[in-house]
Amino acid sequence: MTNIRKTHPLLKIVNHSLIDLPAPSNISAWWNFGSLLGLCLMIQILTGLFLAMHYTSDTATAFSSVTHICRDVNYGWLIRYLHANGASMFFICLYMHVGRGIYYGSYTYLETWNIGIVLLFAVMATAFMGYVLPWGQMSFWGATVITNFLSAIPYIGTTLVEWIWGGFSVDKATLTRFFAFHFILPFIIAALVMIHLLFLHETGSNNPSGIPSDSDKIPFHPYYTIKDVLGFLMLILLPLLLLLFSPDFLGDPDNYTPANPLNTPPHIKPEWYFLFAYAILRSIPNKLGGVLALVMSILILAIIPFLHMSKQRSMMFRPISQVLFWILVADLLTLTWIGGQPVEHPFITIGQVASILYFSIILILMPLASLIENKILKW
């Protein structure tokens, strides 16, 4: 008798995706981040659901409802900090996942890569709207500043901003709609993840060497299920250490002050995972130019496949490209640091240099390095 997992219409899909899936035999720990992101999404949806049971999306009670969750709800503090620090882990995994895609040339799977970019934008939108919900000072002013960027769009900008706000300023209508969107978006993300996987399984997974591995496949279960479980344990350990010892380490103290439209915080800044894009935005004095640079800092990922000049797919055997890649990583860390600093000398100049370097590495230096490497190898 054939095993039910191979005949049942529903279990068959699970079987082909997680059990009998032929996987390359040499994929490293960098390939763990896909499953870790799935775990992060599940944790966020579950903790978010329990938070939504106690949260009220009204300007008068939002801040106190979060306080109530932390003080009066059974393990409410744990759920709240799991959700907040879970978002940080989500973005760490996301950036690692994208970085791995760039390093090993996974972007040549165009459909998978493009759905991934849509996913990145969706997660960023969700995180931004979630940050507004506790209705602290940084929530309110973050929402005001970020939504105001849309006013840079010529002709329709101001109308668009007021339409998003639901009034002439960030207020009750804004908070209510942000809560609604913050609740629905993770389910849209889950659907996009299914499409992402569907496209990935059309081509099969890439591997560190970048060479087709059709002749050398192993079943996903037990080899990579065990490997993923090890990743899960490590991923759960990190945020647990963080949230049990210093849960507010990655947060902003200003968000423990209730939102006050009459009092602007000295430094308005987003969560740490948006600081690199925020630094790029601030490095351009013109408002529209800054907003375009902000969008392009992420959208540039869509151009990367068309800038691939190398005859090799992966960077594993390309030392010049490797050096450039790690300079890019260091540059992004520099931008993250600059985004959290006040707008004054020397931070302005460092931010501008780092922003120019970011775009020039991706658009000019990496394709050039690829051509030089081809020449060296006489290809």
From Swiss-Prot:
Binds 2 heme b groups non-covalently. Heme b b562 binds at H83, H182. GO terms for cellular component: mitochondrial inner membrane; respiratory chain complex III. Its main location: mitochondrion. GO terms for molecular function: metal ion binding; ubiquinol-cytochrome-c reductase activity. It is a multi-pass membrane protein. GO terms for biological process: mitochondrial electron transport, ubiquinol to cytochrome c. Heme b b566 binds at H97, H196. It comes from the Eukaryota. The chain crosses the membrane at residues 33-53, 77-98, 113-133, 178-198, 226-246, 288-308, 320-340, 347-367. SUPFAM superfamilies: a domain/subunit of cytochrome bc1 complex (Ubiquinol-cytochrome c reductase) (SSF81648), Transmembrane di-heme cytochromes (SSF81342). Pfam families: Cytochrom_B_C (PF00032), Cytochrome_B (PF00033). Keywords: Electron transport, Heme, Iron, Membrane, Metal-binding, Mitochondrion, Mitochondrion inner membrane, Respiratory chain, Transmembrane, Transmembrane helix, Transport, Ubiquinone. A ubiquinone binds at H201. Heme 1 (or BL or b562) is low-potential and absorbs at about 562 nm, and heme 2 (or BH or b566) is high-potential and absorbs at about 566 nm. The cytochrome bc1 complex contains 11 subunits: 3 respiratory subunits (MT-CYB, CYC1 and UQCRFS1), 2 core proteins (UQCRC1 and UQCRC2) and 6 low-molecular weight proteins (UQCRH/QCR6, UQCRB/QCR7, UQCRQ/QCR8, UQCR10/QCR9, UQCR11/QCR10 and a cleavage product of UQCRFS1). This cytochrome bc1 complex then forms a dimer. Component of the ubiquinol-cytochrome c reductase complex (complex III or cytochrome b-c1 complex) that is part of the mitochondrial respiratory chain. The b-c1 complex mediates electron transfer from ubiquinol to cytochrome c. Contributes to the generation of a proton gradient across the mitochondrial membrane that is then used for ATP synthesis. This is Cytochrome b. It comes from Lepus americanus.
